[in-house]
Amino acid sequence: MKKGVRKEVLTPGSEALGERIQRIRDKKGITQHELATRVQTTQSAIARIERGEQNMSTEMIARVSSALNTPVITLGNDAINIQIEGRHKLKGEVTIKTSKNGAVALMAASLLNQGKTTLKNMPRIEEVFRLVEVLESIGVIVRWNDSAMEITPPDHIDITHINRASAVRTRSIALLFGPLIHYFKKFSLPHPGGCKLGSRTVKPHLFALERFGVSIVSKEEDYHISRHTLTPNEVVLYESGDTVTENAIMAAARIPGKTVIKFASANYQVQDLCFFLETLGVTIQGIGTTTLTIEGKPDINTDITYAVSEDPIEAMFFLSAAIVTRSAITIRRCPIDFLELELLKLEKMGFKYTILKRYKALNEKTNLVDIKTFPSTLSALEEKIESRPYPGLNIDNLPFFAVIATQAKGQTFIHDWVYEERAIYYKELDKLGAETILADPHRIYITGPTNLIANEVITPPALRP
C-alpha cells in the first residue's frame, strides 16, 4: 500500500463489521463512550460504525482491534481474513435477504425496458455494486433510494465506454449478452471475472443465442457479438445452466413471435426473471418447468416496480449454522420451493424443525415460510448426497452438507460432480479436526460426528464457498 493512502472497508461489509465490533464491545462490558475515548474518536462515530453507516480505514480497524484487545479482522492484499470465535449457541431470529443471483439478472433485464425500472429490496453487495458501475459507464442512470434501485436506460447506450475494470471483476457481465443484442448489431464485452470455481465456457450461450441469429466469438480479452435480424425459434439448451437460460429468455423477450426454450433451468433466479418480464408485458408459459414458451414484445416502455425475491442459499447457510451448533433459532422469509429437497434430506438425517408460517413474497409469486430449528442429533444418510439443476438439491447448497456431515454419525458420501475442483476444498475441514477421504476431485467421504477445533482455513476462490 502506498504511503499516505488508507485502504477502506466498504459496505456491505461495513454492516457485518459494525455488528461484530458491537458484539465484542458488549461482551467486554465497554461502552461506546469508552471505546471512542480509547480510539480517539467521537461516540457518534462509534455508533455509526456499529450501525454499518461509516466506512472504516485499515488504520481505524487496527485502532479498534487494539482498544478491544481482540482482532476484528485482518486484511491481506486481495482478501479479508475473518476470525471467528466458536462454541457459541445461536439464539433469536434472522430474516433472509434477497438473492444476489436474482438481483443481477433483474438489473440486466431492466435494459429491455425503455422506462424506469424500480427494483425493491436490492442486496447491497459487491457483485451488485460492480454491475452498477458497468451500467453507469455505458450511460444507464442508476439511483439508490434506500434499499430500492432505480434503473433508466439512456436513448443511446455507449458500449465503447464500458468500465472494463469493474466488468472483469464480476461474472454478471455475461448477463448482458441477451439484453444488448436488442441495442446493437455488433458489440464487444470483456471476459467475466468474479467466481473462479470450475471451468466456464461461453459455448452454451453461443449455441443458444445463435438460434436467434446471434454470433459470439471469443477473443483473448473480449467476446465479439454480432447479429443479423433477430428471429424467434425453438432453442434446445446445451446445458441447463441458470445464466444461459436467462440470456435465452432475455433474447426472446423482445423478439416478436413465439420462442420455445427446452431444457431450461427452473432455478429461483430464472423464475424471478420470468415473473419480472411478465410485469413488463412479456407472455411466458411454463415458469417453473424445463420448457418455456415466450411471446416476445418488441417495444417495452413502462415505469414499473418489482421486488426481488429471497435467497435460498442464505437460508441454507443459517439452517446449517443452526444444525452444526445445535441451536434453536427462527429463520424468516425462506423461499421454501427451493429448499424442500434440502430439508427432506436433513430431516432424514435427524434434523428437527417446524414451519411456523406460510406466505407470499413481495413479488406475490414466490412462496415463503418461517422455519424454527431445534437442537438435533444427526445420522449419515446411506445414499450419496449430490446436487442437480432445480428441482434437485441446489448446486450452491451442496458445500453446506459437507460441514453438516462432520456432525452426523456414520460416513457421508458427497458427490460434487458440477465443479472440477470444489470437492478438494472440502479437505480444509481436516484442519478443523474433520475425518475426510477424498476419493477424487469430485467425491469425498466424511465420517462423523467430530468435535471440531479452531484452526486457520482457506476458502475457495468462489462467491459461494
Please annotate each region the language model reported:
Residues 2-27:
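A short, Lys/Arg-rich alpha-helix, primarily the initiator
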Residues 23, 43-44, 48, 55-465:
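Short, structured segments at the rim of ligand-binding sites
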Residues 31, 42, 53:
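Helix-turn-helix DNA-binding motif, specifically the short coil turn and the N-cap/start of the second
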